[in-house]
């Protein structure tokens, strides 16, 4: 019975025993590898190996600092950047400072759900699709990587550094690696482990050849994984997808000794691997691998032993995490890459989606304004002949760096409701190309008023501008007038205790920061609310602070958000402890008084005892001195405590 037509479960578990090829056969297999037509097959992979990088753990750090150096060959590239939070052992991801350094223009599709984040980048090179809901820091003009790393180190302990060549997508896993060293020193060809995985944009070269003297149509797919910089146990996931439903095929996987395989295939195949492997439909069953030659010709010779007539796909890759092999057909059709044909690339490769993402209107002072960066338009290779509102007589003004389109609310076809202003923007191109149209809306901030109120009870009855240390505070952001056109959310809040104090984070990325900050239900009118408990242990104790909240506002008919910051000045007072407890001077005074009274009483009792008992022989008195440093040590510890966080557990006494 032909093995190639065995039922899938049987053939997936079929183990090929090791065959040791002779040297002559390995050198003379009669199979000249040639590049394959890209339309005949595709190989994609993700890897954690970067051209240069490092991973470190920042002990006791409140902020992670990650630095990505992006090197692109073309004038414009696209990148998908995803940040994933780690919640090992139930701990939340701490604050993150991410530095993006790019050598060319890049459009970034960014995802970072519910992660407190600061981004530092050069806005003239890095363009985000949609405004990221994070804190932005302008990257200073620095000329070398060392200068950038020195600057990044001032923001906190560096957790990871990675240099990537032409990435298409990056997944950065946040959190501390307990096995990493405490210092991040970049190394060439570094394996970033679970911290970072990325997919290169460059097409993976695939080779193929026909084995001389072998008849039939049995195909071989060979994947060779090259060793990485670090030898550690690793499982490589291989997804093999063939479009045909019948045929005889062989899959040969070769890798370093520490690599095992998890195989996901949709076709009956013979499997030959180094290292143990398991298949998706039987994940619990592991099959031992065999010893295979460590050369391309040796692996081809193994395919020949299994009666393969064609090596349909031969691929060599660096140490990868996942690899996907797709073949458009099978059954013995062999086709190498055709001779290149000289073609003239189209002059206009403008992306309408990316161009329209640059249209971001702003409203204020009864005027809608949008500015289109001319450099970004040129980077997109777009040629614009006109930028107007719905009323074509309202045209953009051409400045040195921007095309600026603006209009009062009363003209150019503006549609104005109580709090939202809308219009249509039309972008015209040279003759022959249809214009692009985009409906734009923005919130009229002048029509809304915002007030930040502090209350001392959960009933929110009487506002106050004074907070007592150790007392729970209740905060409400009031928006007037009431409207259903705009929804308001608390994006972030913090309490600034001044230049000599701390910045106390209360809310980050719409999530309570700490166990003593609580997001409350909105008011009956829909106003956002939260509460916090502040205990400050600083010398001297701060007497004032500034409470600031960043609000995210969104029109009910639009997904794009705008932001508004509201602040209020707070007075901070120490609690009146007359009926609640004793402060440190009182405690010391009472202690000294009690000691003095006790000493006098002891002396009096000893005097009475010594003069009233009989003249019997007295025993010697032995005095044991208490350590003199105990009291001063306690005092020093209380003075040295400096901390300000919501619901801090530090102590002053």
Curated annotation (Swiss-Prot):
Transport among keywords: no
MF term (GO), any: BMP binding
Role played: Vascular endothelium glycoprotein that plays an important role in the regulation of angiogenesis. Required for normal structure and integrity of adult vasculature. Regulates the migration of vascular endothelial cells. Required for normal extraembryonic angiogenesis and for embryonic heart development. May regulate endothelial cell shape changes in response to blood flow, which drive vascular remodeling and establishment of normal vascular morphology during angiogenesis. May play a role in the binding of endothelial cells to integrins.
Region feature Required for interaction with GDF2, mapped onto this chain: 27-337
PTM-bearing positions, type Phosphoserine: 641, 644
GO annotations of cellular component type: endothelial microparticle; external side of plasma membrane; nuclear body; receptor complex
Signal peptide interval: 1-26
Region spans: Disordered: 624-653
Protein name (database record): Endoglin
Cytoplasmic side, ranges: 607-653
Biased composition (Polar residues): 635-653
Subunit structure as annotated in this protein's UniProt entry: Homodimer; disulfide-linked. Forms a heteromeric complex with the signaling receptors for transforming growth factor-beta: TGFBR1 and/or TGFBR2. Interacts with TGFB1. It is able to bind TGFB1 and TGFB2 with high affinity, but not TGFB3. Interacts with GDF2, forming a heterotetramer with a 2:2 stoichiometry. Interacts with ACVRL1. Can form a heteromeric complex with GDF2 and ACVRL1. Interacts with BMP10. Interacts with DYNLT4. Interacts with ARRB2.
Disulfide cysteine pairs (residue numbers): 31-209, 54-184, 244-330, 350-382, 363-442, 394-412, 493-549
Segments passing through the bilayer: 582-606
Tissues of expression: Detected on blood vessels (at protein level). Detected on adult pulmonary artery, capillaries supporting the heart muscle and lung alveolar capillary endothelial cells. Endoglin is restricted to endothelial cells in all tissues except bone marrow and is also found in stromal cells within the connective tissue of intestine, stomach, heart, skeletal muscle, uterus, ovary, oviduct, testis and thymus.
Ranges where the record places region Essential for interaction with GDF2: 270-282
Anything else known: Lacks a RGD motif, contrary to the human protein.
Keywords associated with the record: Angiogenesis, Cell adhesion, Cell membrane, Disulfide bond, Glycoprotein, Membrane, Phosphoprotein, Signal, Transmembrane, Transmembrane helix
Membrane topology: Single-pass type I membrane protein
Region described as OR1, N-terminal part: spans on this chain: 27-47
Domain writeup: The ZP domain mediates dimerization.
Knockout-associated phenotype: Full embryonic lethality at about 10.5 dpc. At 9.5 dpc, embryos display abnormal yolk sac vasculature and yolk sac anemia. Mutant embryos are also anemic, probably due to defective hematopoiesis in the yolk sac. In contrast, the embryonic vasculature appears grossly normal in most cases, but heart development is abnormal, and nearly all mutant embryos had enlarged ventricles and dilated outflow tracts. Besides, many had abnormal cardiac looping and displayed pericardial effusion.
Extracellular side: 27-581
Record-annotated ZP domain positions: 363-510
Chain intervals with Low complexity compositional bias: 624-634
Keyword match Phosphoprotein: yes
């Amino acid at each position: 019975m032909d093995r190639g037509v065995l039922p899938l479960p049987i053939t997936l578990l079929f183990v090929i025993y090791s065959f040791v090829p002779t040297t002559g056969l390995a050198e003379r297999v009669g199979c000249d590898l040639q590049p394959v037509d890209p339309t005949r097959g595709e190989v994609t992979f993700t890897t954690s190996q970067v051209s240069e990088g490092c991973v470190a753990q920042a002990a006791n750090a409140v902020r992670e600092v990650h630095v990505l150096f992006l090197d692109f060959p073309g004038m414009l590239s696209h990148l998908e950047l995803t940040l994933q939070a780690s919640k090992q052992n139930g701990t939340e991801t701490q604050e993150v400072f991410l530095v993006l350094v790019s050598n060319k223009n890049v459009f970034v599709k960014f995802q970072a759900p519910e992660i407190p984040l600061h981004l530092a980048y050069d806005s003239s090179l890095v363009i985000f699709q949609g405004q990221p809901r994070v804190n932005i820091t302008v990257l200073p003009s620095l000329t070398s990587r060392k200068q950038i790393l020195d600057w990044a180190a001032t923001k906190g302990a560096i957790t990871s550094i990675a240099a990537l060549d032409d990435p298409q997508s990056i997944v950065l896993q946040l959190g501390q690696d307990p096995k990493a060293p405490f210092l991040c020193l970049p190394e060439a060809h570094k394996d970033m482990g679970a911290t970072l995985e990325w997919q290169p944009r460059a097409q993976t070269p695939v080779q193929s050849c026909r084995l001389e003297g072998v008849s039939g149509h049995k195909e071989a797919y060979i994947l060779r994984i090259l060793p990485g910089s670090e030898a550690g146990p690793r499982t490589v996931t291989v997804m093999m997808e063939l479009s045909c439903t019948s045929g005889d095929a062989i899959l040969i996987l070769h890798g370093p000794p520490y690599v095992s395989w998890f195989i996901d295939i949709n076709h009956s195949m013979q499997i030959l691997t180094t290292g143990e492997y398991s298949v998706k439909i039987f994940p619990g069953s592991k099959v031992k691998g065999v010893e295979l030659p460590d050369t391309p010709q040796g692996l081809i010779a193994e395919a020949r032993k299994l009666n393969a007539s064609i090596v349909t796909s031969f691929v060599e890759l660096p140490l990868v995490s996942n690899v996907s092999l797709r073949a458009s057909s099978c059954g013995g059709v062999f086709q190498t890459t055709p001779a290149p044909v000289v073609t003239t690339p189209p002059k206009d490769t403008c992306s309408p989606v990316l161009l329209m993402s640059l249209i971001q209107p702003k409203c204020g002072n009864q005027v809608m304004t949008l500015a289109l960066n001319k450099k970004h338009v040129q980077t997109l290779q777009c040629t614009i002949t006109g930028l107007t509102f719905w009323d074509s007589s309202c045209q953009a003004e051409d400045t040195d760096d921007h095309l600026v389109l603006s209009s009062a609310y009363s003209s150019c076809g503006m549609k104005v409701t109580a709090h939202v202003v809308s219009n249509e923007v039309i972008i015209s191109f040279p003759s022959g190309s249809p214009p692009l149209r985009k409906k734009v809306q923005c919130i009229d901030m002048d029509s809304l008023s915002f007030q930040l109120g502090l209350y001392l009870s959960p009933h929110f009855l009487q506002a106050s501008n004074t907070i007592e240390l150790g007392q729970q505070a209740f905060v409400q952001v009031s928006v007037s007038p009431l409207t259903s056109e705009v929804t308001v959310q608390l994006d972030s809040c913090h309490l600034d205790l001044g230049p000599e104090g701390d910045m106390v984070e209360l809310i980050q990325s719409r999530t309570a920061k700490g166990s003593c900050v609580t997001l409350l239900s909105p008011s009956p009118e829909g106003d956002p609310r939260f509460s916090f408990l502040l205990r400050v242990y600083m010398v001297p104790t701060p007497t004032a602070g500034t409470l600031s909240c960043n609000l995210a506002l969104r029109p009910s008919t639009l997904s794009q958000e705008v932001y508004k910051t509201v602040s209020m000045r707070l007075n901070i007072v120490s609690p009146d402890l007359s009926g609640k407890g004793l402060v440190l001077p009182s405690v010391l005074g009472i202690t000294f008084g009690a000691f003095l009274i006790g000493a006098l009483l002891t002396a009096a009792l000893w005097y009475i005892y010594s003069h009233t008992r009989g003249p019997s022989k007295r025993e010697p008195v032995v005095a044991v001195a208490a350590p003199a440093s105990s009291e001063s040590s306690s005092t020093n510890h209380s003075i040295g405590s400096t901390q300000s966080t919501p619901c801090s557990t530090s102590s002053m006494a």
